[in-house]
A protein has these predicted regions:
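Basic, glycine/lysine-rich polyanion-binding surfaces/domains
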Residues: 1-205
Length: 205
């Protein structure tokens, strides 16, 4: 099924708006949406200021994701290298993911944005939230900022980028996104956390 929804207000020219597979969950949680970069993005939730003091999570599925292939792909295994406002994460010696950013894509890049859904979990208890559904060792001395860890997330294949000491980007299959949201939401709420809008996340960057 296509991820694009078409809007035709007042008979105007059709505008394609891409939507996250977790949009339904976000709506049910009271999200307010704005169209940003062609995506319908959840930017605010009721009570999110309180949530951000413990552990918040936000839908980051709209981040651009490109797969780079070749004998000289950048990066090192196990590391996430910061390049401007993007991350480069090497999957194998010949494959890497470029996450985020708005620079021109290399001609050999494959757009895999809608192959991977994404959630960012942040806050003082972010590691504790993740530990409730993921066995990857994310202790600071083992996985400092700039680490890249493929593994199981909520019993699904996934990857984690350690963006900062209290901020983690989780990537997982588009098709299982609603299930992963439910698992993460349960874990966060058990610690008095919950969903946070994309705008608030940027303010905490």
């Amino acid at each position: 099924m296509s991820t694009l929804a078409f809007l035709s207000p007042n008979g105007a020219e059709d505008v394609a708006v891409a939507r996250s597979p977790m949009e339904g969950k976000a709506k049910a949680a009271g999200a307010r949406f704005e169209v940003q970069g062609g995506w319908n993005v959840a930017v605010e939730y009721p009570g999110q200021d309180r949530v951000g003091q413990t552990a918040g999570f936000t839908d980051a599925s709209h981040l651009r994701k490109l797969e780079l292939q070749g004998d000289d792909v950048p990066g090192e295994l196990g590391e996430a290298k910061r390049e401007g406002d993007a991350w480069i994460c090497q999957l194998t010696p010949t494959r890497a993911l470029l996450l985020g950013g708005d620079h021109a894509a290399p001609p050999y890049a494959v757009d895999v944005t809608t192959c991977f859904a994404a959630l960012t979990i942040f806050g003082p208890q972010a590691r504790e939230v993740i530990a409730r559904f993921c066995a990857l060792d994310l202790r600071p001395q083992v996985a400092p900022p700039g680490s890249f860890r493929p593994g199981s997330i909520a019993r699904q294949p996934g990857m984690i980028v350690v963006e900062d000491e209290q901020r983690f980007l989780l990537l997982f299959g588009w098709a299982v996104a609603e299930y992963v949201w439910t698992v993460v939401d349960d874990a966060a709420r058990s610690l008095d956390g919950g969903p946070v809008g994309w705008g608030a996340l940027q303010n905490n960057a």
